[in-house]
């Protein structure tokens, strides 16, 4: 299954080198970042799940960039809110 997935995923991304980068980035998000898979896990490793997500058009480099920017903005807003709450508590 992985071989077919790789061929289909290459068609979605454009070339195998970019595919490796996008799949590794997404797999790392799931493995280290605690992100949930967008497809059923089916007892697959994160790299295979990432390839399946790419194959289905759920993930590409632009989507990953947008999601990371949104998460960063949310984190910055939460940090600002926490700092504001601390500053107001000291008054």
From Swiss-Prot:
GO cellular component: cytosol; cytosolic DNA-directed RNA polymerase complex; RNA polymerase complex; transcription elongation factor complex
One MF annotation (Gene Ontology) recorded for this entry: DNA binding
Record-annotated disulphide pairs: none
Keywords associated with the record: DNA-directed RNA polymerase, Nucleotidyltransferase, Transcription, Transferase
E.C. number(s) listed in UniProt: 2.7.7.6
Pfam families (UniProt xref): RNA_pol_Rpb6
Keyword tRNA processing included in the entry's annotation: no
SMART domains for this protein: RNA_pol_Rpb6
GO biological process: bacterial-type flagellum assembly; bacterial-type flagellum-dependent cell motility; cell motility; cellular response to cell envelope stress; DNA-templated transcription initiation; intracellular iron ion homeostasis; nitrate assimilation; protein-containing complex assembly
Reactions this protein catalyses: RNA(n) + a ribonucleoside 5'-triphosphate = RNA(n+1) + diphosphate
InterPro entries for the chain: DNA-dir_RNA_pol_omega, Pol_omega/Rpo6/RPB6, RPB6/omega-like_sf
Family: Belongs to the RNA polymerase subunit omega family.
NCBIfam families xrefs: rpoZ
Assembly and oligomerization: The RNAP catalytic core consists of 2 alpha, 1 beta, 1 beta' and 1 omega subunit. When a sigma factor is associated with the core the holoenzyme is formed, which can initiate transcription. The rRNA transcription and antitermination complex (rrnTAC) consists of RNAP, NusA, NusB, NusE (rpsJ), NusG, SubB, ribosomal protein S4, DNA and precursor rRNA; S4 is more flexible than other subunits.
PANTHER family recorded: DNA-DIRECTED RNA POLYMERASE SUBUNIT OMEGA
Function noted in UniProt: Promotes RNA polymerase (RNAP) assembly. Latches the N- and C-terminal regions of the beta' subunit thereby facilitating its interaction with the beta and alpha subunits.
Protein name stated in the entry: DNA-directed RNA polymerase subunit omega
Protein's organism: Escherichia coli (strain K12)
The encoding gene: rpoZ
């Amino acid at each position: 299954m992985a071989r077919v997935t790789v061929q289909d995923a290459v068609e979605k991304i454009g070339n195998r080198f970019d595919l490796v980068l996008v799949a590794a980035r997404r797999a790392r998000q799931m493995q280290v970042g605690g992100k949930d898979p967008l497809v059923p896990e089916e007892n697959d490793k994160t790299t295979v799940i990432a390839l399946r997500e790419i194959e289905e058009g759920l993930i590409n480099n632009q989507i990953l960039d947008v999601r990371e920017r949104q998460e960063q903005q949310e984190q910055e807003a939460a940090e600002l809110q926490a700092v504001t709450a601390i500053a107001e508590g000291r008054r």
